[in-house]
Every structure is written in C-alpha cells, then in structure tokens.
Amino acid sequence: MQIETLYDVMQWTKNIHQQLHVFAAHCALENDSERSELLLEYISSHEKKMERVIRQFEDNGNSNSNALNTYCRHFYEKTAIPIHLTGEHPFEKMDTDEIAIATLEYHKNIVGLFEYLQNCSSAPSVTEFLSNILSLEEAEKRLLARNMKQIDDL
C-alpha cells in the first residue's frame, strides 16, 4: 500500500487491525494449547473491534477532510512498521507470552507512528485529529494488555 496522506495512514492502520484479527482467528483454530486459543480468540475479537472503531474514526474525520488529506509520505517512510501479512503467521508456533509480546509490539509501533506524526504536525486540525486517534490507540493498547494478562492468569 502506498502511503501519501493521513487518510492512507488510517487505511493502513485499519488494515493492520483487520489482518491481526484474521490471523489471530485462524491461529486460534490451529493452536493446540487451550490458553493460547483463548488468548488468540480475545485478540481476534479486540482487533475486529479496533477495525470498526478506526473505520468510524475515518468516517467522522471525513467531515474534516483537510486533516485526512494532509500529506505525510516522508514521515511515514521514516517510521514504517513491518508486519507479517501473508502466508503462515508466527502466532501458530508461539506460546501465550510470545503472542502477547508480539501483539503489544504491533500496537506499540502503531502508537509510535501516530506520536511521530503528531509531533511533526503544525496544523491545528491535524494535530487534534492525531491526538484523538493517539488517545484511542493508547487506551486500547492498555486495555488489550490488561485483558491478555487476565486471560494468562486463568
């Protein structure tokens, strides 16, 4: 996917959440460990929810099209996040701790990208938009971490 505008970053973020949902759901079916299966099912449902939330955020942001049309290609290129999107996913061979760490790493990188974009922004509408999405992603990352810990404690 070519990233040129903030709208493209939002599409990319939504795609990451969607792919994590699909991979976690698939790996939950393939995993032999009941604990890992529970964790992957939770991650799948959480990522599906995040995909919907990002879509709603985009829809609401369309009313402020100036922010979404902001050019940010060179910022994205400096902070591109590698993600495994095709074929076999490593979740299939991971234990619960490794799954949790990998999932939180994806979210940490997404938060880092939005922090970087926010710090580079000078337009108030763009800064506000990024601040809102950043707050959402940070809150969801904390919720994900807390709930994964509770599943691990079962």
Regions from the PLM with identified roles:
Residues E34-R35, N60-L68, I151-L154:
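Short alpha-helical linear motifs
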Residues M1-N31, T96-C120:
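Alpha-helical bundle segments that constitute or directly flank the non-heme di-iron/ferroxidase center
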Residues I54, E58-G61, S65, Q118, ...:
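Leucine-rich amphipathic alpha-helices with coiled-coil/heptad-repeat character
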Residues Y106, I110-Q150, L154:
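Preference for long, well-ordered alpha-helical segments
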Residues M10-A24, L40-I54, E58, H107-I110, ...:
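Alpha-helical transition-metal enzyme core signature, strongest for iron centers
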Residues N60-M94:
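Carboxylate-rich helix-loop segments that flank metal/cofactor sites and access channels
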Residues M1-Y7, H84-D97, K149-L154:
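Membrane-interacting alpha-helical segments
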